[in-house]
């Protein structure tokens, strides 16, 4: 797992572990293996305000809405940063226990590569991505705290480039606070989405 962490930190930013036969273990055993492997990379952190550490992504029959996380619906998810409305984890893992009969595709994109593409082709819009956007928190906060948070897509701390991007949360955030996303911000989000979706 040391090599995996090195690849995450200094390599392409993702890796696939595919030598473990899911048919040889129960669901609980697979979760335990996932927990152990994850712990060898970093300390696991909650995926929700309620403290959920391992989070099932499945269709619960709910419809997308301002208080419903999209990963609990059958809605297709765009490329996004998990938990972008609060504090996204440094690493993110996904374990496939059972593939869907239909749909359920997963993909990976690099927000660093997207940043560099935006810098080359859309520098003015990239500047807007360094300024805050409203993000819907989908009820993932303590009572009485704001329902939306405000964060830029990109920030640089002098050492590392940090990124959080979720178009759905941005659009819903502006709707929640009763404000209109500025035209430059809308174009920046749409262009970023196009860059991430390009083959």
Language-model features, listed with the residues they occupy:
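Contiguous, non-catalytic segments that form substrate-binding/exosite surfaces or channel walls
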Residues: 49
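Active-site environment of non-heme Fe oxygenases that use a 2-His-1-carboxylate facial triad
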Residues: 1-3, 10, 15, 22-24, ...
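"Short basic amphipathic alpha-helical interaction patches in structured regions
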Residues: 28-35, 110
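A short alpha->loop->secondary-structure connector
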Residues: 34-45
């Amino acid at each position: 797992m040391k090599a995996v962490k090195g690849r995450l930190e200094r390599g392409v930013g993702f890796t696939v572990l595919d030598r473990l036969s899911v048919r040889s273990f129960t669901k609980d055993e697979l979760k335990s293996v996932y927990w152990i492997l994850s712990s060898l990379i970093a300390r696991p952190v909650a995926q929700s305000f309620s403290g959920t550490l391992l989070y099932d992504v499945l269709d619960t029959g709910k419809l997308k809405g301002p208080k419903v996380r999209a990963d609990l619906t059958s809605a297709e998810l765009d490329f996004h940063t998990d938990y972008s409305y609060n504090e996204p984890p440094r690493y993110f893992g996904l374990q496939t226990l059972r593939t869907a009969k239909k749909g359920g595709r997963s993909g990976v994109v690099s927000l660093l590569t997207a940043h560099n593409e935006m810098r080359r082709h859309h520098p003015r819009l990239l500047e807007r991505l360094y300024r805050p956007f409203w993000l819907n928190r989908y009820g993932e906060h303590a009572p009485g705290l704001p329902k939306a948070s405000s964060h830029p897509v990109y920030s640089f701390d002098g050492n590392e480039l940090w990124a959080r991007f979720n178009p759905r949360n941005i659009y819903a955030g502006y709707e929640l606070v009763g404000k209109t996303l500025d035209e430059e911000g809308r174009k920046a989000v749409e262009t970023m989405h196009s860059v991430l979706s390009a083959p």
